Amino acid sequence: MPRLLPMTLMLLLAFLPCLARADTCHGQNLIATLPPAQLTELKARAEVPYAHGNLWTATKDGHRITLAGTYHLSDPRFAPILDALAPALATATVLLVEAGPEEEAAIKTRIASDPGLMFLTSGPTLPEQLTPQDWDRLATALKSRGMLPFMAAKMQPWLVTTLLQMPACLFPLAPGADQGLDKQLMAQAAAQHLPIKALEPYDAILGIFGQFTAADQLAMLSQTIAADAQSGDMAATLADSYFAGESHLFYAYSAQAMLALPGMTQAEADRENTLVDRAMIAQRNAAWIPVLEAAAQTGPVLAAFGALHLPGATGVLNLLAKRGWTITPFDPRLTPP
């Protein structure tokens, strides 16, 4: 379930060492391989409000918010996006992100002081909770990422799930592996002495995983283990979809791909997708709206957050539109000086 990755990358990089990369990923875009009829059907399912594009502008009563959907891993394709956003960054009074420098420092401190956030401190270990076959497959997947299996035996299931969503070719993690669009904008903002503020408290992400039962977390881990052979292809598909402005198309594809997992039923896939969407996207979107609107009262705002938060009926763009904001595709030529 690659949708977990953006929300937990910060936690993952706070735990794992960042070393020199040993390889480069060359995955296949799985959406591009679909037969025309299946692609047409997928696109129809993915057609929701504001489904296409990563950069948007919201205006209301003279207030202006530039919204940038982000992808959280480094990629050279960010260069033209950063160039396009330069006028908005130069005129902004604040940069809003999911987690700013203060929040990142706070979560690292919290992790160091509370091992239970990321580790099983009591009860059965993962080898005891998973089937022998799943543990053997997990051990193989971990070894391909340069990790000894015992290192994961007491990790929280959601953390191992997130780890497996990063394909083996990314390991060991390179310095700067997390330099996605948001991090690069933060660096530019800091150089301009522009305030950087968070859309949510540092511990909001911890509350998200509290909404998943232990059984849900184990089920997600088992599904991710079963799909590990395609992790490189899924990562490539996600990146390509993002840079094509089609992140929601990938979201729809990943939901469909769940049905190919062993034992997965439509009812269970729908239940899990609803749970993930509500906990990781919809609830957070609703909580961000007051923060965005309050920031806009003091001047132009540039907000950068995961691209999957933009589209859909419960997406940030539609929620703003329902509150009277005019939503238009971002055009740097129209950014006021």
Locate each region found by the language model:
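Bacterial N-terminal signal peptides that target proteins for export
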Residues: M1-T8
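Cleavable N-terminal signal peptides
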Residues: T8-M10, A20
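N-terminal signal peptide c-region/cleavage motif recognized by signal peptidases
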Residues: F15-L19
